[in-house]
């Protein structure tokens, strides 16, 4: 299954707000339903609940079905909680790191910067959005002038307290902002509201 490139509002109406996909907020149809309407709705199956959790994770991080399945398999082979390791793997992707630093408004925007070879990790150009960042990595945004003003405005409007503790943003060189990975992200710093166990259960027979 390929990466979704259609209307984003259609997705968040169905799956609720996904900060990585779009910064627009919308009240989901589930929340809009009145109490009487909710009582008449059919009982949602456990499969549908797990499927929705999986779809929320996939669309938020901009993954294909195959990519997400591969991440689940990697998480299963690692020591510790499979769900938390899965979230950690996704959060430490380069495209997501740029998003969490506040350099770009969404993960698709971060992917565009990376694909255009404007991002350096430890002084080396990285053009792979899925690149796995590690503690002590230094990420430099070396965008051309056409991007610099956009990035500067974005950073100025982004509250510093929104940057999670495992990351640090340095503006000592305004034209080349740098991000520092302090340590691996913990569960409390995950930006997406999700029950990762539902995703693990969904893939229990596939991974």
Swiss-Prot record:
Keywords: Chloroplast, Plastid, Ribonucleoprotein, Ribosomal protein, RNA-binding, rRNA-binding. It is found in: Plastid, Chloroplast. Residues 92-156 form the S4 RNA-binding domain. GO terms for biological process: ribosomal small subunit biogenesis; translation. GO terms for cellular component: chloroplast; small ribosomal subunit. One of the primary rRNA binding proteins, it binds directly to 16S rRNA where it nucleates assembly of the body of the 30S subunit. With S5 and S12 plays an important role in translational accuracy. Belongs to the universal ribosomal protein uS4 family. Part of the 30S ribosomal subunit. Contacts protein S5. The interaction surface between S4 and S5 is involved in control of translational fidelity. This is Small ribosomal subunit protein uS4c. The gene is rps4.
């Amino acid at each position: 299954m390929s990466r979704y490139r259609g209307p984003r509002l259609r997705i968040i109406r169905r799956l609720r707000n996904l900060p990585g996909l779009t910064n627009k907020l919308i009240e989901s149809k589930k929340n809009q339903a009145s109490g009487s309407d909710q009582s008449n709705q059919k009982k949602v199956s456990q499969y549908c609940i797990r499927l929705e959790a999986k779809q929320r994770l996939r669309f938020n991080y901009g993954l294909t079905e195959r990519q997400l399945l591969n991440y689940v398999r990697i998480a299963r082979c690692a020591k510790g909680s499979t769900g938390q390791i899965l979230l950690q793997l996704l959060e430490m992707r380069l495209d997501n790191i740029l998003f969490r630093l506040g350099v770009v408004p969404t993960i698709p925007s971060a992917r565009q910067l990376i694909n255009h070879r404007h991002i350096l990790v430890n002084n080396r150009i990285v053009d792979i959005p899925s690149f796995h960042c590690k503690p002590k990595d230094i990420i430099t945004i070396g965008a051309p002038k056409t991007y610099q003003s956009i990035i500067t405005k974005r950073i100025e409007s982004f509250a510093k307290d929104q940057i999670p503790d495992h990351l640090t943003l340095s503006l000592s060189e305004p034209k080349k902002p740098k991000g520092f990975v302090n340590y691996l992200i913990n569960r409390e710093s995950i930006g997406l509201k999700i029950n990762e166990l539902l995703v693990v259960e969904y893939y229990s027979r596939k991974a």
